[in-house]
Swiss-Prot record:
Signal peptide: none annotated. Keywords: Amino-acid biosynthesis, Isomerase, Methionine biosynthesis. Its EC number is 5.3.1.23. It comes from Acetivibrio thermocellus (strain ATCC 27405 / DSM 1237 / JCM 9322 / NBRC 103400 / NCIMB 10682 / NRRL B-4536 / VPI 7372) (Clostridium thermocellum). Belongs to the eIF-2B alpha/beta/delta subunits family. MtnA subfamily. This is Methylthioribose-1-phosphate isomerase. The active site is at D235. It comes from the Bacteria. Catalyzes the interconversion of methylthioribose-1-phosphate (MTR-1-P) into methylthioribulose-1-phosphate (MTRu-1-P). The gene is mtnA. The record marks C155 as: Transition state stabilizer. Pathway: Amino-acid biosynthesis; L-methionine biosynthesis via salvage pathway; L-methionine from S-methyl-5-thio-alpha-D-ribose 1-phosphate: step 1/6.
């Protein structure tokens, strides 16, 4: 179920736009293909996007044919800018590209071939770190999950959104593996249906009981007492704990608070943007109207209707019970406690 695999200058991605009906691997051999794959959501999920971007820089560096370090770094910087322009909200994308570029710059005294190898090694290290991080998030998050709980999740923050195991689904997996009798309610997550297509599929692969619901049913099931907690992933977390995640997350958080249900965010510390104070500074990606007006190429809305399609929303920190990271669980007040995890 790994969404990505890199070997000998070729990045293989599981095309997530085709799941669950078709499991197709696409092979990317240049950075333009990598950038397009990120933009078109062949790969998605903040951690997976970050590592994919890092491998994209590695692939690009191999193709730069020059003996001039000045030309090499100028071309490498252009590549980094192009990859970073693909999706504006997920901070892991920028963090990952900047990290591999910094590794190259800090070793400027080495030969160009040695620098290329170091970029590749850094990307591989990031993949390894992500998997370890997700396992740790799962272990910490499992401490919050009680026997016989029903967990509501939104979008897909599982193995498909990371390099393996997952963040929000990592917590769910850890609880299941520890023997707890849990079940999951998965929002379908309009308009891209990551919950229906990806989360439900992932959980069924692992034999974790899952019930699929429409997004607008969540409040009903909370009021009926059928939901014990909500766990979601994150694409960017501000210093005060405000969290950007898939559109619809904010609504779930408000509903959870109204019904006295704990609302947890599970994310690695690489998703924390220490450069911004609040969620108001997080850019929100607006995607194609066709994602709303069409399903599988079939029009479901009137021709010419106006459409808004923000891909993310920001959940204010007051609705978040805790943030589960690989370094531990962060509780309010977030503006005091998050900075301790830098």
């Amino acid at each position: 179920m790994k969404p990505l695999e890199y070997c000998n200058g070729v990045l293989k991605l599981l095309d997530q736009t085709l799941l669950p009906g078709e499991q197709k691997i696409v092979e990317l051999k240049n950075y333009i293909e990598v950038a397009d794959a990120i933009k078109n959501m062949i790969v998605r999920g903040a951690p997976a996007i970050g590592v994919t971007a890092a491998y994209g820089v590695a692939i690009a560096s191999k193709a730069i044919n020059t003996d001039s370090k000045e030309e090499f770094f100028a071309e490498l910087a252009k590549v980094c800018d192009i990859i970073k322009s693909t999706r504006p909200t997920a901070v892991n994308l920028f963090w990952a590209v900047d990290r591999v570029y910094s590794r190259a710059v800090s070793n400027r005294d080495k030969t160009i071939e040695e620098i290329k190898k170091l970029i590749e090694e850094e990307a591989y290290l990031m993949e390894k770190e992500d998997i370890e991080s997700n396992r740790s998030i799962g272990r910490f998050g499992n401490e919050l999950i009680k026997e016989n709980w029903t967990i509501l999740t939104h979008c897909n923050a599982g193995a498909l959104a990371t390099c393996d195991y997952g963040t929000a689904l990592g917590v769910i997996r850890a609880a299941h593996e520890s023997g707890k009798n849990i079940q999951v309610f998965a929002d379908e997550t309009r308009p891209y249906l990551q919950g229906a297509r990806l989360t439900a599929w992932e959980l069924m692969q692992d034999n974790i009981p899952v019930t699929l619901i429409c997004d607008n049913m969540a409040g009903h099931f909370m009021k009926e007492g059928l939901i014990d907690c909500v766990i979601v992933g994150a694409d960017r977390i501000a210093l005060n704990g405000d969290t950007a995640n898939k559109i619809g997350t904010y609504s779930l958080a408000v509903l959870a608070k109204e019904n006295n249900i704990p609302f947890y965010v599970a994310a690695p510390t690489t998703t924390i943007d220490f450069s911004i104070e609040t969620g108001e500074q997080i850019p929100i990606e607006e995607r194609s109207p066709a994602e709303i007006t069409h399903i599988k190429g079939i029009r479901i809305a009137p021709e010419g209707v106006k459409v808004r399609n923000p891909a993310f929303d920001v959940t204010p920190n007051k609705y978040i019970s805790a943030i589960i990271t690989e370094k531990g669980i962060i509780y309010p007040p977030y503006d005091e406690n998050i900075k301790k995890y830098r």
